[in-house]
Amino acid sequence: MSPNGPGAPAGAPALVLSAPSGAGKTSISKALVQTWDDCLFSVSATTRPAREHETEGLHYHFMSEPDFVAMRDAGQLLEWAEVHGHMYGTPQSNLDAARQRGLHLILDIDVQGAKQLRAKVSDAVFVFVLPPSAETLVGRLRGRGTEADEVVERRLRNARGEMEQAFDFDYVVVNDDLDRAVAEVRAITVGNVEFSLRAVDMSGTIRQLQTRIDDILSEGFSA
């Protein structure tokens, strides 16, 4: 479907994007929604405080922990997870709205949430996004300018573990060039995909990244 074309047909599958922090899944998600009218971004709920540039309802639905827990206990979340000390979740209403409009819901969530969605949303497509190198990942994390070195190191350690979960996803995309990564994810969304993007075929790339992260951490986080 071309940009700005008609909406996706009824039953358009949801697209679940997961990645280590700094791999670029949010940039890919935003590009899909900005370019194609048949995509709807799923705004997550979170207990994390808003950053200076973030807007309620656009980046996240920011809420207190008691309100989040009440929503979860009422069965109003498709998935939820605690990440880096904060709770994140996907409101059921996001998927309902997308299905009513015949749109692909684009979910930008962590690997814990993706696992829960796998059990609940049978027609969703799951994509794991990788950085092109461990050095690039470190650079992106540091380039945010909002995290202390110890936080970046913790995220790098978490990234190494999250990459192990990539084999549970349908496809793996390496975000070495944003436009190309967006094109690959779009192809996956509409079912026009290269077999080489299957997770099982990317095992060598995943293992190389993990090994290099191990090296960086053992060198005292000096990348």
Predicted feature residues:
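Conserved lysine of the Walker
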Residues: 25
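NTP-dependent small-molecule kinase module
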Residues: 2-4, 146, 164-223
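Post-Walker A helix-loop "phosphate-sensing" segment adjacent to the P-loop in P-loop NTPases
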Residues: 34-42
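ATP-dependent small-molecule kinase phosphotransfer cores
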Residues: 46-105, 112-115
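P-loop (Walker A) phosphate-binding loop of NTP-binding proteins
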Residues: 18-20
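Post-Walker A alpha-helix
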Residues: 28-29
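Conserved phosphate-donor/acceptor-positioning beta-strand/loop module used by diverse small-molecule
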Residues: 105-110, 119-143, 174-177
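Extreme N-terminal, non-catalytic leader segments
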Residues: 1-15
